Amino acid sequence: MPEAVDPRSWSKRAGRHTPMSIAGVGAVTGYGWGAKHVWDGFMLGESAVQLHTGLDGYVDGGQAYVATISGDGARPGGPSRFMRALRFAAREAIADATERGWQPGPVVGVIHSMVLGDVEMWRDYYRSETGTVGGRQWVQMMPGTVISMMMKENDFHGPAMSVTAMCASGNAGMITAKSWLDTGVATDVILLATDLSGIPENLRRFQDIGVAVLDMPPFEGCRPFQEGSRGFVGGEAAVALVLSNQNVGTYADVLGGAMTMDAWSAVSIAPDMVQMNRCFNEALAVSGVDAGEVAYINAHGPGTAQCDAAEARILDELFPEAHGIFSVKPLIGHCQGAASAVEMLATIYAFQTGYIPAPPRVAPGHPRLITGRTPRRRGMMVKSSIGLGGYNSAVVVAEPTV
């Protein structure tokens, strides 16, 4: 059990805006259970998206391309895919960080980036004849239960909360975690981002509003920043990142980030882009970075006309010196509430291997669109994420200093 520590002995760090290190990584994705499968998928340039059949009555043609997480019910962690994937990712990230020299500080907090929670358990609950389940199962459905189980397993007792900002939830969690470290709320943070909502009911709704493409392979239908793109392909992910100010071997340093809200439309980007521009500029300002120091934009890039046009405009106007822009959604799918967290792994991969894991270009597109696995030039990256409803977010990430 960790020794009790007087908060005054570590709160002297409060207010010191030092880089926040990503010290450990865990992931469950359409590639498989474990971050290694993500690295392998990025290296090979292969998509995790597969064709799923038997969806008659939900999607046109009864089949859809989506990067779902396998059930793998033999793994420990709980009765649902959601719970098992979250706890697996957390275990992997903590073990990874420990191997790299990280040790839990006196106050380890947990932030869970999520949107819909355990959709399969809630779906079964509402579809039951009586609308009731046993008390134990009902408690397991609560979003705080799996966090409590994860923290109990690791003897963590710091602050814990869930954050939601639609598709920008992962970035929202990252920015919140940095504020905790900067102000002394926690000494370390486990950031979790979980979204296993790739069920037929949700896929159909995204198709209905014209943003998802279900009937074409990923590289054909989802073409971020290219002509002929029809939208995004669905995806699922559970990601865990160990975040700390400790001087240990790290994957990347998060310098800062910002968020704004358009407050204009539930489904569209404000055409004047005032708030989106402010978001990127504030992210640079709080990070102490000039736009000219940014080499790449790891974009939200869902392949929808509005989002791609907006981020391309940001690239052209705010980052004219950047080497390029890319989006890994054709590779890993749009993982909704976990999107920006799982896409942060692409930045980590680039820093660790020296290659940008961009999908191949299949049509004419933006002149600075990175195509295929490409050698990386030195410089910082901005991870942007846009959430349905008007959420804008940007996080500035630098190569690790340790």
Where would I find each of the regions flagged by the language model?
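Conserved small-residue
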Residues: 22-24, 42, 90, 110, ...
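Flexible, low-complexity linker/loop segments at domain and module junctions
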Residues: 1-22, 104-105, 291-293, 369-402
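Phosphate/pyrophosphate-binding loops at sites that engage ATP/ADP/AMP, CoA/4′-phosphopantetheine
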Residues: 91-108, 154, 247-251, 279-296, ...
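Short, well-ordered amphipathic alpha-helical segments that serve as non-catalytic structural scaffolds
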Residues: 85-98, 144-146, 272-288, 314, ...
